[in-house]
Amino acid sequence: MSTPEITPAAVTFRVPAGTPAGAAMRELGLPNKGPEAIVCVKETEGESAGQLRDLSWVPQQDVEVAAVPANTDEGRGVIRHSCAHVLAQAVQKEFPGTKLGIGPAIDNGFYYDFQVAEPFTPEDLNKLEKTMKKIIKSGQKFERKAYDDVEQARAEYADEPFKTELIADKGNVDPDSDEATEVGAGELTAYSNVNPRTGEVEWYDLCRGPHVPTTRYIPAFALTRSSAAYWRGDQSKAGLQRIYGTAWESKEALAEYQTMMAEAEKRDHRRLGQELDLFSFPDEIGSGFPVFHPDGGIVRLEMEEHSRKRHIASGYSFVNTPHVTKGDLFQKSGHLDFYADGMFPPMQLDGETDDEGNVTKPAQDYYAKPMNCPMHNLIFASRGRSYRELPLRLFEFGTVYRYEKSGVIHGLTRARGFTQDDAHIYCTEDQLEQELTTVLEFIISLLRDYGLDDFYLELSTKDPNKFVGSDEIWERSTEILERVATKSGLELVPDPAGAAFYGPKISVQARDAIGRTWQMSTVQLDFNLPERFNLEYTAPDGSKQRPIMIHRALFGSIERFFGVLLEHYAGAFPAWLAPHQVVGIPVADEFNEYLENFAADLRAQGIRAEVDTSDDRMQKKIRNHTTGKVPFMLLVGGRDVEANAVSFRFLDGTQVNGVPREDALRIISNWIAERRNDQPSSELIQPLVEV
């Protein structure tokens, strides 16, 4: 009988007071090498539950912790942040005089910002990688140091202006910001890279940690690119150079990631959008504001139309609200208190002056709306509501505007102006569980309609330091959300303290064709806005009761979902979404009329069909429409005309010849009507031809 294998991710153990966590870990025989090497521990109880700690950490009292292996998301984050330190050490060694910005771990990698005399070149990155490998091979130790006071830290970083600014801001940075990596809550600390042979400090940096024990715990990394950046993402502040990299628990994991990224580059929706003439981002309009071209407009229309039909069938009422509103509305909703940085500056309207220029009526602030929910609340509150009307489901394709910093804008997936498939549901507490179940089932069903079918759920729960409403209602609603999520049968991943202040949330995460995860849909409970807007309904006993509000957006935004689908399908949309569903390609001009007649029959059934009558040779036409991702290409020559038939050509290069016209019409119309998401091919079409 073989020895059972310990799964590091499942291991919890107690660390006695006065004992380093790493020593307690070693007594258990947990791995310190390979992809499952333990890189840090996580507290599991008390007020510090969820806090990551170095293996060198010595607790003052007995404490239970969980081992964090390298091959977990948290473990990779620690490896990447440690690798960012190695990068910064290498930069200051190779480019003396460089000033340090910040260097956090990010999704799948890390970055570090530097103030340097000249932008980094690809050759510079190659040189830095070599220096980093030497540092990693030397096995430098990461040692934590806590400062007694701010002045001590300020003196130590006197030559680092960006660090001294962070030190001055200690305790006042957004806990979710990248800067919090260095000066978040708790002690002001730094980490030194220590030579294991001499004990000398080779380099140090302001940082909260944690870090891997030594640089040898960074087995695989790569620098990926450099770009311009601004200090703290503010264009009015100093210009910097940012180097991006990635780090993994093994060379195999790094190679797998690099293969996926190479495929992702081919699928980049920004490149495909230009190649397929789907959308653009004109400089004259501004960064983050996409313009959809005719072909992209068709795809978007099909996406919206199918969603609209499904919503109507599911009992949603369509509403429409304006793009701009008075600032008082967002004051009432709390957006100006909690979300002002994400809104565009106000416009001052409705002011009046007399002939001498004296103000007779003060102007009011108007804002482009960042969210639709306040206006939907006004619709609910526009008249008295009865319990018989609940659940009330208000739905809108509502365009919103959010001031995203230029550095985070990314094509369609992170824009400044976008349209949400936004719904707000008002229900009683007794209806909540069934309504959440119905919403989640609807989300999964609709996403599957578009060809996404690999999901897991994430449950975001209360941040004990930032919430409204009673503990009781949070606990009850979180239990309901967890029960609904569990009933779905999908994997449920906890996100402790990840909820917004106004209620717990389930998010649907979808994996695409190359295994990347995208957050698609959110189902968010809200205990805040019904109170702020004094929303009420009349209960059966005649009393006035507060409804529970559910926010939900299935696509996130139309634009983002468009970009995700474009990359998922590598530009080859399913036939029902494709802007050009059928293109006829005559072998010679004499067959144009025959194909035009057949295309007319297809168009009569609502199919987007056309004939390529250009002067290009047939093979060039085939190449053009293959590049254009047309799912059905119909070739016609003399034999086809004689047999009253057409020949199919598919994107994979296969063909089915001599298909009778009636069969071809039936096959194409059924394929599109069924909204099949697979690409047609000879293997799939041949069996559909009647013998």
Curated annotation (Swiss-Prot):
One GO cellular component term: cytoplasm
Record-listed E.C. numbers: 6.1.1.3
Any matching Pfam family: HGTP_anticodon
GO biological process: threonyl-tRNA aminoacylation
CDD domains found in the cross-reference section: ThrRS_anticodon, ThrRS_core
Record: residues binding Zn(2+): 373, 424, 551
Cofactor(s) recorded in Swiss-Prot or TrEMBL: Zn(2+)
Location of region: Catalytic: 268-574
Record carries keyword Nucleotidyltransferase: no
Domain TGS: 1-69
Cofactor: binding details: Binds 1 zinc ion per subunit.
Subcellular location: Cytoplasm
InterPro entries (UniProt xref): aa-tRNA-synt_IIb (IPR002314), aa-tRNA-synth_II (IPR006195), aa-tRNA-synth_II/BPL/LPL (IPR045864), Anticodon-bd (IPR004154), Anticodon-bd_dom_sf (IPR036621), TGS (IPR004095), Thr-tRNA-ligase_IIa (IPR002320), Thr/Ala-tRNA-synth_IIc_edit (IPR018163)
Description of how the protein assembles with itself and partners: Homodimer.
Name of the protein described by the UniProt record: Threonine--tRNA ligase
